[in-house]
Amino acid sequence: NTRSMQKELLSKETSERWRILYCNSLKNYMAHACVDGLLALLTDSSESEKLKTCLLEALAWFTHSYRKPDILRVCDQLRKDKSLSENLREEAGRTYYRLKN
């Protein structure tokens, strides 16, 4: 069930391994309705870099989403945020440019 997967991805109670698995499934089952939760996850400093990187990779597949402007806005903020790791900023930049072009 797609809704169940989305709920598990957004839940901090779910193990990171499963959250990453659900995150990868977003490439095939784009969950436009839960983009707000996904973007909140990206900006949550308590979430792991590994999970955020995986989520950015998945969001790069949302090229035709009606939520693309929101994803672009957050990716732009992340790629410019010097307090984040270089790896995370680069992934945010890749997602940003893939969606923008």
Task: List where the protein language model places each region.
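Amphipathic alpha-helical scaffolding segments comprising HEAT/armadillo-like alpha-solenoid repeats
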Residues: N1-L10, A31-T43, S65-K80, N101
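Short inter-helical turns and helix N-cap capping residues of alpha-solenoid HEAT/ARM repeat scaffolds
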Residues: E13-S15, S46-S48, S83-S85
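Structural detector for internal amphipathic alpha-helices that build alpha-solenoid repeat scaffolds
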Residues: K7, R17-A31, A40, K50-Y66, ...
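Short, surface-exposed loop/turn motifs that are enriched in glycine and acidic residues
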Residues: K12, N24-N28, S45
